[in-house]
Amino acid sequence: MIAASRNKIAASNAVWWIVFAVAVAAGVFLRCWQFGSQVLIDDEWHAIQKLLYADYAGIATHFGVADYSIPLTLYDRFLSLHGGLSEWRMRLPMLLSGIALIAVAPWLMRRRAPAATLATWSMLLAISPIMVYHSRTARPYAITTLLVFIAVVAFFEWWRQRDKRWAMTYVFATFLAGWLHLITLPYLLMPFAFCAGTALLRGHERWRDLARLLLLGVIVALPLAAALLPPLLNDMGALAAKSETGYVTVHSVYRASMLALGVHQALPFTVLLALSGLGAWSWWRREAQFVAYVVTIVAVAAGAVMLAHPAWVQNPGTLARYLQPSLPFLLLFAAEGVAVVLSRLALAVRAAIVVFAAAALFHAGPMPGYLYWPNQLMGHPYFQADYDPAFNPYYTLLPTGPVPSFYHRLAQLPAGSVMLVEAPWSIVSYQDPEQLYQAVHRQFVKIGMVAPECGMPPAYGQYPETREMRLREVRHLSAILRGESKGADFLVMHLHAWPAYVPPPEWPDVSGCLPTIEAKLGPAVFRDADMEVFALSAKARAIVSTWH
């Protein structure tokens, strides 16, 4: 009987190990697909703008008006000084953290949940659209999500076991996550309040437990203070200017919750919430304290984030990323709920349902709509601001056409057969239509920096042509005019800001630099009222000759 039982458990574990392997493979693929060709956009430029004009000390002691993550910017500064600053290197820590979460989180919970729950959970983590997105962007949210989860679990294990290794794990994760982004501190420090409350109910042991909490609090406060006090003292005004400026509504919470769960329809959203509630109830029956601990931390920390009214939190995308540390726990309980629902079915049937249900959830989500090749702007809010076009301001407030005829002509060529340099370029995503154009022409795109030939307005993310900056998806007009096109076939010069009814504060003097471009590259091979296109290669000239 014992041998038969062991064989049954081994067979069950083997099946769920296969599901887990599928989840890891899917997660790695989704996070790495076209990873090296993605264009930096929006907040990803904050670090570059800072390191261009600051040294290590200046970076470490300021938060900045346009907030940047201090540790990541220090990392970027190191890369730039050693000739290695590129898009994929900037994003590499987030990529590794996003992949690590799929494996590390189930490993940390291996003694608390059955294999079916952990394998299902890894699948949900792997295909989570917002986690995939943040694993591919040069912002700290993928790292902080991993670190907050580790910190919360480590604190609970330390509280239960009194093992110093868990305490040190908590201190390290809390220090790094808090330094990466202040918004994580409510999640990181709330365990003290919960455990202090439980300690007060322990009778004569309460003072010993409270003393332990106090000691750990001092230990974690020291490195946090060393890292955060200098920028807090220097930039208190900037922080104050960004707090109490946003607002939260029921609608924004609802849309942010749908974003977090990766759906845009009410039915899958309701099903996922119901499964999470069922899973929390099932877990409560076997380990009530852990559920109470997690629910308290998530609820209070999320409430604290919303009550702080940080800037732009009224946008569902902003609120969703600030609350992302809650998501692994929500998906954990949802996975437990799935295990409960399927518990009476045969093992192979349960595993098959989990895999096919995950595939269906992925298909119903946003990613199939933007994983086409090549798409170098997957992080554009056009795809990420809201997964329902009816609520995405990049659909509802900005034009979605018309697409210039030049791009329709390129669409007749094989995908990925030519390379365009699009100039000028705005780091503000709502002033860039390239995601609309690439969806039509399906060719490779590089960003064109037009300084100094066309002026250098700071708002447009212009940076000088230096050895330190080796962004692969950027081309400098000055280099192109020297004949260094680096594989580009067409230079597309946009004459006017886009969209016309949302003009930027400044726009480079394109008309003023066109004579210089024509003198070096020859006459434009295509022009209309909004653009002039120049051939940079023999291949481009051969393509254009067929149009005539």
Stretches with model-predicted labels:
Residues 3, 100-106, 195-202, 267-290, ...:
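Hydrophobic, aromatic-rich transmembrane alpha-helices
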Residues 10, 111-113, 151-169, 177, ...:
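Membrane-interface transmembrane helices that cradle and orient dolichyl/undecaprenyl
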Residues 20-21, 172, 218-220, 284-287, ...:
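Signature aromatic-anchored transmembrane alpha helix within multi-pass, membrane-resident enzymes
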Residues 21-26, 169, 174, 212-222, ...:
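Transmembrane alpha-helix segments characteristic
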Residues 25, 92-112, 150:
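Transmembrane-helix motifs of polytopic, lipid-linked glycan transferases
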Residues 27-29, 121-122, 134, 166-182:
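Membrane-interface alpha helices of multi-pass inner-membrane proteins
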Residues 134-135, 142-144, 186, 270-273, ...:
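Hydrophobic/aromatic-rich transmembrane helices and adjacent perimembrane loops
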Residues 366-548:
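Extracytoplasmic
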